[in-house]
Amino acid sequence: MSGQEVRIGVLANQGDENCMKLWGATAKYLNEKIKDHKFFIVPLGFDEINQSVESGDVDFALVNPSIYVELEMKYDVSRLITLKSQVSGKELIRFGGVIFTSSTNTTINTLEDIKNKSFVAVDAESFGGWQTEWKEFLDHGIDPYKEFAKLDFAGTQEQTVYKVLSGEYDAGATRTGILEQLAQEGKIKLSDIKILNQCTSCNFPFLHSTQIYPEWPIARLSHVDDRLAHEVALAMMEMKPVDEAAKNANIAGWTVPQNYTVIGNTLKTLKIRPFENYGEISIKDIII
């Protein structure tokens, strides 16, 4: 792939514009480190990831863990490195979900209180912005798809938060770190937020309501040669928190790939892609 363009598909879970603000400098960083290739960031919506990978329109993919697990099973991609997030000087390689309502909402104080209420999340395929929270509800004996008055998806993390604070929805879900980020940017006040099912047991600095999972990976597609994959992995793991690419993305850098087995187990519990038929016995299985 020497001299060729290298396209990094990135899940744009906060919209295309924010995606480029966050990750554009990463392409610049790689262009400076690996001079015989030209790297580009390609923002992709939740509904665009599979097609882009299947068609080979991208060479690497930076996606949430549940999408990665599906891509690994369906298209033989392989994890290369894992993101290190950063908060208050602490480096993190895990994240989770937050279930919240407005601090002025006196009728919702527990997960049980959300029954027969309206709820908004980011996207059906958002791991931190819906799937982790969905599993948490199931663990508490609550089926959101049957017991909520309304369940909608806002499309981005930021819009999800605004729709709850405006009173359009009774409660919502977002990935960890988003509330703190919006507060730091002066867009919301944390005092206006009430966290539901708040977890304090594990050593994790963000507000969270769910189990904690390994962070986003960068995956290489099967057509990418070993030499380029090795160069990209080494360059990314050399990234420091002070580098423009890290600062723009609000991360500490990158580390060796983590174990994503727990993600697969969660998807099996939810019975969603690529495990939508998990546990079911087909006629083919019986014949075999």
Per-range role (PLM):
Residues 53-54, 114, 164-165, 232:
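Hydrophobic residues within well-ordered alpha-helices
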Residues 7, 11-12, 81-98, 188-233, ...:
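Periplasmic-binding protein-like
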Residues 118-120, 124-224:
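Pocket-lining segment of extracytoplasmic ligand-binding domains
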Residues 1-70:
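Extracytoplasmic small-molecule ligand-binding "clamshell" domains
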Residues 40-54, 64, 84, 144-162, ...:
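Short helix-initiation/N-cap motifs at beta->coil->alpha
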Residues 9, 14-25, 209, 224-288:
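An extracytoplasmic/periplasmic, membrane-proximal ligand-sensing/linker region
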Residues 3, 7-31, 89-162, 177:
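Bilobed "Venus flytrap"/periplasmic-binding protein-like clamshell domains
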Residues 59-60, 79, 170-171:
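Short, Asp-centered acidic motifs that coordinate Mg2+ and/or phosphate
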